[in-house]
Amino acid sequence: MMKVLAVNVGVARPNPAKRADLTGIDKLPVDHAVQVRAPGPKHVGLHSGVVGDPIGDTKHHGGDDQAVYAYAREDYDWWEEELGRELPGGFFGENLTTTGIDVNGALIGEVWRIGDTLELQPTFGRIPCSTFQAKMGEPQWLKRFARENRTGAYLRVVTP
């Protein structure tokens, strides 16, 4: 059974990859409720589906099809073993750190229900970006991350 271990929200910081001036990839767990909404189109909408979560590169991130990003604790555990270092929830920039669900095997269009009313729908797996590469500092990280098919899932908001 799926469980949300943490809801993570970012803080706008200088982007180490310099693609955009700022990035919101640095996310930390919050201990309060957050509002989730459909943000609208990528280039003109509210960008993030999680209120208060900044997106620096709105050309490539955000919008309805990338409203929320989920990553599984089980995949973090696998990467910790591979990389030999600790990776806390939120480190990959996800809004939801989950357990008990194969996030990478999510079917596009299925509906995830969280809490009493929130419904999210997987849209596609993460395509890693240069900001993620810079944050990780691992050689060939983008290719390695994609090759291992442990990308997590982007989600659209069906019912806030």
Task: Identify the function of each model-found stretch.
Residues 120-152:
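Flexible glycine-rich active-site/ligand-binding loops centered on an Asp-His dyad
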Residues 1-133:
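Electropositive, beta-rich accessory/interaction domains or terminal extensions
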Residues 153-160:
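Well-ordered alpha/beta subsegment
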